[in-house]
């Protein structure tokens, strides 16, 4: 049975946090053992433009716009959101009501939500992290994390020194390096732990 991930790209997203979802699920589909393949489709989604410009200027053409799929969200099993840079206008879209409503829709149905780095702040803005464990970007060169404090201000219980935090259906992480591991965790949830371990080994992790 095919599973589907809606991979939301907000303006100013980080490429390093986007590509692991595509690669990990692609490797899962291409397993040499036909009986062991995980049929997980990744559908890239933009808010308002089919061509989304990332942090540092890489442009990605998405499969769909949110307005085109908003009435068919029941087809999707998970939502994934990479983070991005404030000075590349990431929060303009990530904090929009359209994104907040999308996040609330997935959470209300108990569907998996995977965020990388500061994308957790979009989850916080939506209200779904109040009273829940989560994390977000932590600058190891500074004593205090501005982003983690912002997440606290949204009502989250921030686990400051844990790279990936899972609370029920929600996965959050604290820097770009965690992106592949968030993708592996999502694969484990959409298929099984053994499949995720196998793909991780095949990819050299």
Curated annotation (Swiss-Prot):
<dbReference type="InterPro" id="IPR002818">
    <property type="entry name" value="DJ-1/PfpI"/>
</dbReference>
<dbReference type="InterPro" id="IPR029062">
    <property type="entry name" value="Class_I_gatase-like"/>
</dbReference>
<dbReference type="GO" id="GO:0050766">
    <property type="term" value="P:positive regulation of phagocytosis"/>
</dbReference>
<dbReference type="GO" id="GO:0031288">
    <property type="term" value="P:sorocarp morphogenesis"/>
</dbReference>
<protein>
    <recommendedName>
        <fullName>Protein DJ-1 homolog</fullName>
    </recommendedName>
</protein>
<comment type="similarity">
    <text>Belongs to the peptidase C56 family.</text>
</comment>
<keyword id="KW-0143">Chaperone</keyword>
<dbReference type="Pfam" id="PF01965">
    <property type="entry name" value="DJ-1_PfpI"/>
</dbReference>
<dbReference type="InterPro" id="IPR050325">
    <property type="entry name" value="Prot/Nucl_acid_deglycase"/>
</dbReference>
<comment type="function">
    <text>Protects cells against oxidative stress and cell death.</text>
</comment>
<dbReference type="GO" id="GO:0005737">
    <property type="term" value="C:cytoplasm"/>
</dbReference>
């Amino acid at each position: 049975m095919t599973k589907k991930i809606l991979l939301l790209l907000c303006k100013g997203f980080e490429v390093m946090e986007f590509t692991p979802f595509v690669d990990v699920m692609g490797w899962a589909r291409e397993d040499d053992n036909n009986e062991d393949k995980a049929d997980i489709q990744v559908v890239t989604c933009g808010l308002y433009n089919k061509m989304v410009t990332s942090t540092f200027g890489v442009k990605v053409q998405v499969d769909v716009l949110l307005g085109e799929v908003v009435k068919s969200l029941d087809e999707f099993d998970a939502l994934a959101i990479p983070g991005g840079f404030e000075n590349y206008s990431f929060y303009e879209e990530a904090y929009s009501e359209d994104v907040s409503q999308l996040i609330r829709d997935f959470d209300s149905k108990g569907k998996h939500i995977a965020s990388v780095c500061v994308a957790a702040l979009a989850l916080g803005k939506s209200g779904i992290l109040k009273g829940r464990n989560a994390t977000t970007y932590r600058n190891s060169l500074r004593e205090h994390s501005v982003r983690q404090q912002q997440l606290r201000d949204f009502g989250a219980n921030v686990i400051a020194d844990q790279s990936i935090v899972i609370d029920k259906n929600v996965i959050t992480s604290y820097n770009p390096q965690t992106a592949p591991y968030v993708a592996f965790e999502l694969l484990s949830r959409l298929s099984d732990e053994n499949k995720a371990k196998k793909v991780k080994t095949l990819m050299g992790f």
